[in-house]
Regions:
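Charged, compositionally biased non-catalytic regions
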Residues: 1-34
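Conserved ATP-binding subdomain of kinase catalytic cores across diverse folds
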Residues: 21-181, 193-195
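Hydrophobic residue at the +6 position relative to the catalytic HRD Asp in the kinase catalytic loop
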Residues: 189-191
């Protein structure tokens, strides 16, 4: 958490000064956005940082990280000036539901979850899911959901990805109903390349 608080200060300064070419080197830290994994953050750069168009104007921050096996990969996280504590609790409940369904019922509904780290009641970090788009983006790019999934899964049968898509949609609808999640619209509903 100390490293993330340090990063938060840099991000605040970035937004204030609009620095374009600032790089931050950090040591090893517990990733706030992937549970039970340890990464070494090799680079966080503002060169590719962008501000997402929304009411809270969150920062999308690119990182290069290395996992325990030594594999490097690109990673993005969102820094948002908003109270994320309620979202964190809801996402933890969804992750727990997924674990229980898989373990007790042997039921994999292809639920995609992400991690949230509230820093305080005014700001925090959100894991970005790679290879995903909002339904609004698909509509804007004139893609149908079927074409998007089919194009990204050439080695998967139509039956397989349709089953995965339907299962995740059903899970999403039931969980949203049970938890009283409203405000569902094309910009806050996402789909991964796998459906």
């Amino acid at each position: 958490k100390e490293t993330m608080l340090e990063c938060k200060n840099y991000f605040d300064q970035f937004k204030k000064d609009n620095i374009k070419n600032f790089q931050l080197k950090t040591g090893i830290f517990q990733s706030p956005v992937i549970t039970n994994c340890r990464f070494e953050c090799l680079d966080m750069t503002f060169r590719g940082t962008r501000i997402k168009a929304s009411n809270s104007s969150p920062l999308i921050i690119p990182c290069i990280v290395r996992n325990k096996e030594g594999k490097r990969f690109k990673y993005e996280m969102m820094y948002k000036k908003d109270d994320l504590r309620q979202e964190k609790i809801i996402m933890d409940i969804i992750q727990l539901m997924d674990i229980i369904l898989k373990r007790e019922e042997k039921l994999d509904l292809s639920i995609t979850t992400y991690n949230i780290l509230p820093i305080n009641n005014k700001e925090g970090f959100i894991e970005m899911i790679s290879s995903s788009k909002t339904l609004y983006q698909l509509q804007k790019e004139s893609f149908t959901i079927q074409n998007f999934i089919n194009e990204n899964n050439p080695d998967t049968t139509v039956r397989e990805w349709k089953t995965r898509f339907v299962n995740s949609c059903v899970a999403h609808c039931i969980i949203s109903y049970l938890l009283g999640i409203g405000d569902r619209h094309l910009e806050n509903m996402m789909i991964t390349n796998k459906g």
